[in-house]
């Protein structure tokens, strides 16, 4: 079960680097801080498009490399290439070329972000699906727990990379419009870990052929080859219970809040704590590193609160309390001007 999910560790590092640094990268390239949200539309949009497609087509893919593994490998390779090119967008002498008000560097970054988020989704989804494919019902909880642990561990590593590289002496400032070396090397290191972890899972895990898969799940071989799914997406949504829609509505607003956090944390912390909005300044880039640290604190808070929730007799009470605590964390960011006090805000969000 560990081998099945180990690649997820590398994928999550890539995802954490994207979450913590995309606003910083585009602001450094010259994007207006007030329009950063337009760039951030792309990751959830790609997720909405790619995740159902990967599920649909990997259900029907049976080849000598496996069922889910071909998508996993292709997604990882593309993600690695993009992670090498994206942080160098400001170093390619494209800043002078303008189209629709955006410099060539920003267009390069924009298309790189599209490919990065698409490839991360392509690499991420097969790990979740392989647990359903290959783990029996009694062990699925354990398998998903391992995956959750690796997910959080990968997030922590990805978040702290820029701060760590700066701490060991790699430059955290650069000429205007150029991404600092601390961020560039973070993406390089993340790319290396990603491909190593994914290749480990790729070679250590052997997926079931259609006949064995059908026997394992107690379905007809023909149905297994079709993916075992008779209903389309819209039919499944139509038949979904009311609880699905209730939780979905809450999640809708939660993810809206998280998107604000990912988009504007860098600028807000730079202005409130370091007192600067100059993206080329040492203070702004230091704030960018600190974003990774507070995001890591948020991840720790999430892990610890997940251990507390089962102790509630009424889970609805736990979820309501969770939302109120998170809301308090979001509001407090505006009023805090000390970098270490931000630990409280982001811990509450977690």
What are these regions (language model features)?
Residues 71-103, 306, 324-337:
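C-terminal ends and interior cores of transmembrane alpha-helices
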Residues 32-42, 107, 145, 181-182, ...:
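Loop-to-transmembrane helix entry
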């Amino acid at each position: 079960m560990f081998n099945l999910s180990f690649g997820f560790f590398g994928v999550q590092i890539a995802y954490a680097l994207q979450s913590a640094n995309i606003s910083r990268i585009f602001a450094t390239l010259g994007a207006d801080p007030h329009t950063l949200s337009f760039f951030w539309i792309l990751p959830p949009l790609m997720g909405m498009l790619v995740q159902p497609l990967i599920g649909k087509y990997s259900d029907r893919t049976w080849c000598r490399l496996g069922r889910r593994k071909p998508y996993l490998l292709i997604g990882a390779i593309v993600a690695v290439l993009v992670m090498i090119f994206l942080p160098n967008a400001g170093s390619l002498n494209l800043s002078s070329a303008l189209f629709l008000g955006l410099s060539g560097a920003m267009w390069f970054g924009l298309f790189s972000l599209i490919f990065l988020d698409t490839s991360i989704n392509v690499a991420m989804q097969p790990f979740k699906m392989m647990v359903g494919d290959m783990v029996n019902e009694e062990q699925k909880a354990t398998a998903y727990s391992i995956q959750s642990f690796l997910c959080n561990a990968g997030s922590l590593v990805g978040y702290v990379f820029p701060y760590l590289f700066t701490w060991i002496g790699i430059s955290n400032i650069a000429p205007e419009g150029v991404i600092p070396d601390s961020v560039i090397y973070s993406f390089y290191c993340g790319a290396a870990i990603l491909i190593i972890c994914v290749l480990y899972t790729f070679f250590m895990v052997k997926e079931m052929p259609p006949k064995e898969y059908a026997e394992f799940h107690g379905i007809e071989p023909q149905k297994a080859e079709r993916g075992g799914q008779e209903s389309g997406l819209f039919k499944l949504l139509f038949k979904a219970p009311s609880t699905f829609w209730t939780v979905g509505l809450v999640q809708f607003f939660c993810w809206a809040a998280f998107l604000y956090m990912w988009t504007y944390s860098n600028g807000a912390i730079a202005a409130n704590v370091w007192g600067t909005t100059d993206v080329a300044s040492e203070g702004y880039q230091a704030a960018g590193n600190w974003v990774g640290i507070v995001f890591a604190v948020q991840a720790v808070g999430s892990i610890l609160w997940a251990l507390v929730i089962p102790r509630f007799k009424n889970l609805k009470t736990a979820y309501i309390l969770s939302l109120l605590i998170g809301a308090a964390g979001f509001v407090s960011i505006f009023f805090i001007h000390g970098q270490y006090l931000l630990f409280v805000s982001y811990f509450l969000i977690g």
